Structure formats: C-alpha cells, structure tokens
UniProtKB/Swiss-Prot annotation:
Name this protein carries in UniProt: Carboxypeptidase A2
GO BP annotation list: proteolysis
Gene of this entry: Cpa2
Presence of keyword Cell membrane: no
Entry-linked SMART domains: Zn_pept (SM00631)
EC number: 3.4.17.15
Organism: Mus musculus (Mouse)
C-alpha cells in the first residue's frame, strides 16, 4: 500500500523541518580556468546560499550545485551572461526528498517484527540496534568498541571483527559527511557480510585469520541525526563555539594534514570550514587517538559519496606519494573487481588530480602517519541523484563496493609491512 501525501507531509514535518521546494541542482561545465575562477567567486556569494555538491576544479569537469528557489533566476542569468554552460540535473530537490521519506516510513512500518532491511535507510538508533544484534549473534567474532562520544554526547561505536590474538588491523569508516547516507548503509551491510560469511567464504575467513577489521559505520552521528530530523543537506558536525552563530565543522578538513591549506575554508559558515585547530572535532580526535594507541593499523579506508571514485593520497598537495605505483595498481584492481558485478565504472587516482586539492583530509593524515594503504571511496552515483540516492540502489552499491574493499584487504593481507 502506498502512503498518502498527507502521511508523507506529516513525516516530513516531524523528521525533516527544512524543506527544499523548488530548489534545483544544476550541472555546470566550465570551459577554462577563467570560468572556474568565476564559479569560485559565485560560490563565495553567501547571500545566494549555494550548495556545491561537486566544486569547481579543472576545466571541462562537471560542477554540481544546488540552487535555492529564490536564487535560481539570478544564478541562471549570471551563468548565461558569462557564457558558462549549464543544464538542470534535478528539477525539484523536494520531490526526491519526499520520495525518500516515504520509503523510510514505509520500511519502518514493514520492519516491525521482521528482519532488518539492509536495503533501506535507517535512523541512528536503528543502526546502533542492528550493530548490537550483530555482536549478540556472533560473540566469538564481533565485539563493540566505544572510542568516544560526539559533541552532542552520542556514542561512537566501532565494530571489531577478530578471531583473537594481537593482529595487524584494517580501519574502515563511513558517514563522516552526514548527508552521504548510502555510505552508512553500505558500511552496515558490509558488517553483516563479514559476520555472516566468516567460516563459509574462504576469502573472508582468510582475511580475519590474518587481520582484524575495525568498522565505524557512523563517523558523524550528530550530523547524521540532524540530516534526518532537520536538514537533509547537512554535511558538517554539530559543534558550537562562542563567538560564532554558525554551527559545525567539516570533519574531513579537520585532520592534521596540512591543516588550513588549500581546499578548506576559514569561514565558520562554510560547508568546508576546517575548524579552529587540527582535531578540534571530538569525532576526529577519537579516531586519531584510537588509531595511534592501537599502533598496528595497516590500512585506512573511508567511504564517501558521490561520484564513483577510488582515491589515495595526496589531497593537500598534488605531488605523488612515495607509494604511488603500488597504491595506483591496487586501486585499479579494486575498481575492476567492483565493475564486474553491475558494470559500475570508477575513476582512480590521487585526490588532488581526480577531484581537487583539499587539505585536512583523513586519508592524507593516515598516510603521513605511516599507514601505507590509505584509500577513499566515493560511492554511487555520478550525479543523477547525487546525495539523494534511492534506497533501491543501496544493495547493489554495497555489493559492488564489497568487491573493491575485498581486493584492497587481500592485498594488505598479502603484503605485510
């Protein structure tokens, strides 16, 4: 049975107060450096309240920007006056949000008394409950490690997959940017995959007999809750500081990796605000402290969306890392493995050359710490839905991502250092 528009509207009122009626996402293609400079100037116009989903970087690479209804005409007229090509990618953002909310409510009704649906988006409480279920159902393999609490005092719970002993480890996190919901969902599916297939799948069994895996499905719990209850487009943490009315820090600009350099903003109201100091965000510091204290983490992998990319250092500079050849070879093989399932193509390379220069990122920090195998995935899609990927794409996204992850993990297993 389909939900009535009234129920969907009520759900939106309760769970997502900010609406985006009439907002459009434009795909813009700058032809040269001058047009990129123009788009960067446009991005700085705070009164337009533009939300760049894919920022300007190099000529002829697409830029995606959500434009509020009130600014649409001004932005389009400006682009046309500058000779910058654009097209409408999403006609009305609110239409996709309404569909997403309807699916969530329908799933919540359907899940009562039934098994957890990994092909749906869930609240933080539902995710944490399923993590507890995985621990309870697999006591000899899965345990829960609390590495700290968020700014709003929500637990940061990591799932540890281990067969015992003091093994080297792989770190995997998701959801550092709140609105990238397919990443949290993919991470939870991955956790269930590892737990359910150990002992029957030779690849997973071999991996866990050699390595531990630490998996943090929701790296930014405060932001994730806020994206579900107040503003679906929220990206940052929810930290507050005296002297600023703007809330939050971009947690993937807050790491001690050329902190405050190119690609990060000093403006507290920016979605790319790097924060007052490295590791100022408790969510970031909790991970830093845990990984440093563990001392044997050999791979650091983070899941983002969207754009279908598999990247490695560096982001804060455009120089190749010392291990470029090996990292590129591993990433290329992982992308090929991923593609075999559904034909999904990924672009591979260092962050700086694949997207843009960005300082203070997690995998740069990990690599500079000595964790050689540091990778960032940008999951589906390439922009048709952007951050609003329909729930029906969660399972195929998770399934193909696992093949890429497994390729990297097997390389880490076979190349100890």
């Amino acid at each position: 049975m389909r939900l009535t528009p009234l129920l969907v509207a009520l759900f939106g009122y309760i769970y997502c107060q900010e609406t985006f009626v009439g907002d459009q996402v434009l795909e813009v293609i700058p032809n040269d450096e001058e047009q990129i400079k123009t788009l960067l100037q446009l991005e700085a116009e705070e009164h337009l309240e533009l939300d760049f989903w894919k920022s300007p970087s190099v000529p002829r690479q697409t830029v995606h920007v959500r434009v509020p209804f009130a600014s649409i005409q001004d932005v389009k007229v400006f682009l046309e006056s500058q000779g910058i090509t654009y097209s409408i990618m999403i006609e009305d953002v609110q239409v996709l949000l309404d569909q997403e909310r309807e699916e969530m409510l329908f799933n919540q009704q359907r899940e009562r008394g039934t098994n957890f649906n990994f092909g749906a988006y869930h609240t933080l409480e539902e995710i944490y409950q399923e993590m507890d279920n995985l621990v309870a159902e697999n006591p000899g393999l899965v345990s829960k490690v609390n590495i700290g609490s968020s700014f709003e005092n929500r637990p940061m719970n990591v799932l540890k997959f281990s067969t015992g002993g003091d093994k080297p480890a792989i770190w995997l996190d998701a959801g550092i940017h709140a609105r990238e919901w397919v990443t949290q969902a993919t991470a939870l599916w991955t956790a269930n995959k590892i737990a359910s297939d150990y002992g029957t799948d030779p690849a997973i069994t071999s991996l866990l007999n050699t390595l531990d895996v630490f998996l943090l499905p929701v790296t930014n719990p405060d932001g994730y809750v806020f994206s579900q209850t107040s503003n679906r487009m929220w990206r940052k943490t929810r930290s507050k500081r005296s002297g600023s009315f703007c809330v939050g820090v971009d947690p993937n600009r807050n790491w001690d990796a050329n902190f405050g350099g190119p690609g990060a903003s000093s403006n507290p109201c920016s979605d790319s605000y790097h924060g007052p100091s490295p590791n100022s965000e408790v969510e970031v510091k909790s991970i830093v402290d845990f990984i440093k204290s563990h001392g044997k983490v050999k791979a650091f992998i983070t899941l983002h969306s969207y754009s279908q990319l598999l990247m490695f250092p560096y982001g804060y500079k455009c120089a190749k890392p010392d291990d470029f050849n090996e990292l590129d070879e591993v990433a290329q093989r992982a992308a090929q493995s991923l593609k075999r399932l559904h034909g999904t193509s990924y672009k591979v390379g260092p962050i700086c050359s694949v997207i843009y220069q960005a300082s203070g990122g997690s995998i740069d920090w990990a690599y500079d710490l000595g964790i050689k195998y540091s990778f960032a995935f940008e999951l589906r899609d390439t922009g048709y839905y952007g951050f609003l990927l329909p729930a029906k794409q969660i399972l195929p996204t998770a399934e193909e991502t696992w093949l890429g992850l497994k390729t990297i993990m097997e390389h880490v297993r076979d190349h100890p250092y």
